[in-house]
């Protein structure tokens, strides 16, 4: 795990090759996930060199006791890297749909999971937005168009911007969503002072 900014440089090689400590981290994450019924994951590897050919999604599901699992590998670099979004659920989804997010650099997507049917269905969207503001604006417009007509929505993921950013405010208004936990800092992990990861919900929730 990373404990200071300099390690993004000194330990960047760990994103390309497997390291023993990664399994211990997965075990700790699996223990944490045991308390939840529906989990959205980002930047998980589906079984490539960088994860020691361990399907991290399946590993977490097996060790945390999830019956329903789906992964969306958005960036596949042969056997070197296969990472993307994933769903872990104890509740059986009625439908799962994959979307590719717009952007100059391909490799980002949305996983839409529907529980139930009709007007009372719950739509859960798992995603990881672009680093650049211009790219995020396009992706937020896509997301708003996708969920605007849904009655019950949960959006979860790394949105790479704070609740008070102009693009986030535009998304909340256009998609009729709200942030129930503004100011809940998530980054950097060792001393969080920025909110990049969010769970947004519709006003009906």
Stretches with model-predicted labels:
Residues 1-63, 76-78:
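N-terminal, active-site-proximal structural segment of metallo-dependent hydrolase catalytic domains
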Residues 83, 89-94, 106-126:
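Beta-strand-turn-beta hairpins that frame and shape the catalytic cleft
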Residues 48-53, 67-89, 106, 160-205:
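Active site of divalent-metal-dependent phosphoester/diester hydrolases
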């Amino acid at each position: 795990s990373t404990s200071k900014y300099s390690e993004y440089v000194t330990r960047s090689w760990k994103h390309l090759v497997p390291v023993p400590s990664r399994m211990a981290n997965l075990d700790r994450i699996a223990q944490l996930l045991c308390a939840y019924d529906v989990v959205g994951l980002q930047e998980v590897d589906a079984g490539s060199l960088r994860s020691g050919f361990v399907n991290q999604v399946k590993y977490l599901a097996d060790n945390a006791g999830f019956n329903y699992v789906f992964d969306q590998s958005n960036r596949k670099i042969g056997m070197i890297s296969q990472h993307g979004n994933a769903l872990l659920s104890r509740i059986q989804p009625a439908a799962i749909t994959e979307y590719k997010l717009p952007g100059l650099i391909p490799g980002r997507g949305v996983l839409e999971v529907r529980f139930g049917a009709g007007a009372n269905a719950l739509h859960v969207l798992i995603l990881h937005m672009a680093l650049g503001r211009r790219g995020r604006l396009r992706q937020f417009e896509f997301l708003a168009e996708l969920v605007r007509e849904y009655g019950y929505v949960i959006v979860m993921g790394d949105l790479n911007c704070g609740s008070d950013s102009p693009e986030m405010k535009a998304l909340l208004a256009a998609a009729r969503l709200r942030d129930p936990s503004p100011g809940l800092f998530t980054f950097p992990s060792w001393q969080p002072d920025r909110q990049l990861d969010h769970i947004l919900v519709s006003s009906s929730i």
